[in-house]
Amino acid sequence: MIKVIVPDFSDKKFSDRWRYCVGTGRLGLALQKEYIDTLKYVKENIDFKYIRGHGLLCDDVGIYREDVVGDEIKPFYNFTYIDRIFDSFLEIGIRPFVEIGFMPKRLASGTQAVFYWEGNVTPPKDYKKWENLIKAVVSHFISRYGIDEVAKWPFEIWNEPNLKEFWKDADEKEYFKLYKITAKAIKEVNENIKVGGPAICGGADYWIEDFLNFCYEENVPVDFVSRHAYTSKQGEYTPHLIYQEIMPSEYMLNEFKTVRDIIKNSHFPNLPFHITEYNTSYSPQNPVHDTPFNAAYIARILSEGGDYVDSFSYWTFSDVFEERDVPRSQFHGGFGLVALNMVPKPTFYTFKFFNAMGEEMLYRDEHMIVTRRDDGSVALIAWNEVMDKTENPDKEYEVQIPVGFKDVFIKRQLIDEEHGNPWGTWIHMGRPRYPSKKEINTLREIAKPEIMTSHAVTNDGYLNLKFKLAKNAVVLYELTERIDESSTYIGLDDSKINGY
């Protein structure tokens, strides 16, 4: 039995930086109905403020085109699709966190590409045309949405240039050239627009030191630092899936701390620091993303990550995603909070649970957080991620919680291996690749958490709450004031109902 006594007062605030931004598949996917329907659903339930994805300048979005006029090739900037995409985002109430990339094929210096949809990762063959493209894009955004709006959008330059897969030869010097020209082009359009980078993945934090030194020495604009974070090791690949060992959650939190310290010790100690991608695995084919384990694992990141970064963006909100190809089955290890056919995964509910938290943080440890809301109600989240195949994974708790009212209504929501686990039900179904409408409805029904309610009376201002967490459980308790109006019902007597 784990016993916890929650103090009645705290001067600590719980940050909501975990919902500042969420990731998405390439922007061209936003032209699909299921994508937009899912984004609306996620926004309504979790209320992310920004959305970030690849592909702004890729050919499927169609911004950069060229016309042949006589003997001359003239650029043509086509904003038909990006207007439709960004209009949709803003109508839903979510702003773009703009990633500048990848290279339009007509402007590329080579043919190297990444992903099924062939994002070109080579430098521009003509940096002047690139500069003009950037100015045209930013100018169009300002013309359409106004500078007051666009000034709220961070502009991140490229994606993981420290990897050869994402930037030709992982050439740091060439990336710095691209960054300098791009950042200055954006600032020439309007100096109030925020620019940053280098958007690297883990294992290359020296890039951040080099990047900040470069910006200082070359007087290059930089308004924020960005990085990605994943905790999976090298994997075992199959034709359809990848299996990887996941390192403990403190590994990711330590990465957050390390980069924050690098920034503090740089020439720009006060720069905002954004984690623009994070998850357990970096592969969209790892089944871990579909599991209750992922939900329990991510809980600690949501609880503590805001201590070290200005935002951290879960990768991604939906399995409408095509890096490795069009998804081949209902569950396939996709990154999304929501699976195909709008089936919420367990991790979706971890985020939704955190959306219920208050600002005053009364208590926090590695497996629990307790907050008080403005109205005096209390919200508690606890989790039990199980990293190995232990025989006795359950944890029992007794928590004394300060509650500012005598009579308490208790609402409990729970996900674990047996509750709110559509992946498990899909396995019971026989793993149908393309489930029928009936099967999809069953998966949606199963995806909901178990909900239980009760009421209790406090003792000297405290409520004693006992509960058990099974393997990979995440639980949300909400304690609100109970107003009993039973005395207003004349002749009320439930004992006269058969069986009561």
Swiss-Prot record:
Its EC number is 3.2.1.37. GO terms for molecular function: xylan 1,4-beta-xylosidase activity. InterPro entries: GH39_as, GH39_cat, Glyco_hydro_39, Glycoside_hydrolase_SF, Glycosyl_Hydrolase_39. PROSITE patterns: GLYCOSYL_HYDROL_F39 (PS01027). Keywords: Carbohydrate metabolism, Glycosidase, Hydrolase, Polysaccharide degradation, Xylan degradation. The keyword Hydrolase applies. GO terms for biological process: xylan catabolic process. It is an enzyme of class 3 (hydrolase). It comes from the Bacteria. The keyword Transmembrane does not apply. It catalyses: Hydrolysis of (1->4)-beta-D-xylans, to remove successive D-xylose residues from the non-reducing termini. The active site is at residues 160, 277. Belongs to the glycosyl hydrolase 39 family. PANTHER family: ALPHA-L-IDURONIDASE, BETA-XYLOSIDASE-LIKE PROTEIN-RELATED. This is Beta-xylosidase. It comes from Thermoanaerobacterium saccharolyticum (strain DSM 8691 / JW/SL-YS485).
